[in-house]
């Protein structure tokens, strides 16, 4: 599979980004087993049905099928945000959601819990669905809103299951059920006594019946990994769609996206600067994209001064 994916890179680079992944793979791999694995890997990683995806997903690392080590954050991804916040102290206001951002030529007003904050500039780094319906004035221009609407919206879930007996590191993909699972080391260097699973795309989540609980997924995991001693009673299912502050997983440029959409999506609206993984172009869907978008927004604010 890795060799097949490598062999496709030149053709994918030359192909139009509007060509869908299924159309491209049918032309080059037909209905081979390798094509099915690539479909599954792309759909899971992008958390979207493969017919929404551009053949250019074969060029990125998010849907890679190449064997390589994967870095993890000791203590969880939230540690990055907490570490970045340390130097800001009490200037960060937690549990204080903004309800409106109104800007004019000279300043910006942010409404927060019945009070207002006046600023020279604002960076909005909120999930795409919230941004699209936020009370923002001036509003999002039509061309920018259209580019946002063309983005792929990912839907994903995770299942974490404790292990009754230790297991070595592993990573296994279930092609037909569209999920993969892994065991991995933590910051101590020891393998966690937990198997983690991730599934992406609405069809996959429907097939695993995540809205009714973890039972269907647990059965699929048992069938895929009979070598693991699962403690099903401790299983934890988490779904991005059910988080009101997220409403979906992450986004990316898909087959419907047009050249230049990434610049349009991240363009500032007067004194309001837009950040977040959804503005990061080829880095969309990744924490790396979120971080890069923050640096880009900071540069815009400084340039504005």
Map each language-model feature to its residues:
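Short, glycine/charged-enriched secondary-structure capping and boundary segments
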Residues: 88, 107-108, 132, 136-140, ...
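Conserved flavin/dinucleotide-binding core of flavoenzymes
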Residues: 55, 107, 155, 174-305
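Central helical "cap/lid" subdomain
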Residues: 96-97, 102-105, 111-169
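Short catalytic/ligand-binding loop motif for oxyanion handling, primarily in non-cytosolic enzymes
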Residues: 45-50, 80, 102, 130-134, ...
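Active-site rim elements
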Residues: 7-15, 66-74, 145-150, 202-211, ...
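Short glycine/proline- and charge-enriched loop/turn segments
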Residues: 60-66, 138-145, 250-254
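Active-site/ligand-binding neighborhood in enzyme catalytic cores
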Residues: 2-97, 107, 125, 129, ...
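A structural signal for well-ordered alpha-helical scaffolds and beta->alpha junctions
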Residues: 14-22, 35, 74-81, 153-157, ...
């Amino acid at each position: 599979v890795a060799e097949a994916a490598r062999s496709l890179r030149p053709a994918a680079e030359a192909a139009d980004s509007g060509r869908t992944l299924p159309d491209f793979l049918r032309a080059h791999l037909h209905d081979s087993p390798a094509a099915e694995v690539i479909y599954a890997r792309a759909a899971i990683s992008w958390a979207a049905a493969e017919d929404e995806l551009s053949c250019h997903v074969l060029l990125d690392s998010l849907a890679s099928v190449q064997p390589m080590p994967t870095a993890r954050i000791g203590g969880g991804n939230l540690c990055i945000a907490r570490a970045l916040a340390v130097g800001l102290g009490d200037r960060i206001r937690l549990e204080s959601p903004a309800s409106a951002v109104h800007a004019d030529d000279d300043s910006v007003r942010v409404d927060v819990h019945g009070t207002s904050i006046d600023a020279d500039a604002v960076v909005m780094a909120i999930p795409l669905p919230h941004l699209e319906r936020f009370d923002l004035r001036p509003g999002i221009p039509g061309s920018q809103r259209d580019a946002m609407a063309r983005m792929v919206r990912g839907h994903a879930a995770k299942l974490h299951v404790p292990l009754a007996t230790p297991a070595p590191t592993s990573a296994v993909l279930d092609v037909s059920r569209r999920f993969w699972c892994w065991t991995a080391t933590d910051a101590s260097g020891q393998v966690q006594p937990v198997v983690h699973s991730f599934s992406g795309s609405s069809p996959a989540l429907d097939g695993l019946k995540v809205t009714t609980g973890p039972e269907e997924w647990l059965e699929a995991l048992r069938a895929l990994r009979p070598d693991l001693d699962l403690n099903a009673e401790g299983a934890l299912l988490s779904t991005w769609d059910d988080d009101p502050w997220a409403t979906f997983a992450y986004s990316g440029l898909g087959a419907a996206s047009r050249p230049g959409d990434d610049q349009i999506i991240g363009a500032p609206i007067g004194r309001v600067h837009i950040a977040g993984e959804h503005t990061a172009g080829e880095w969309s869907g990744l924490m790396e994209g979120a971080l890069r978008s923050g640096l880009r927004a900071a540069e815009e604010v400084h340039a504005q001064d």
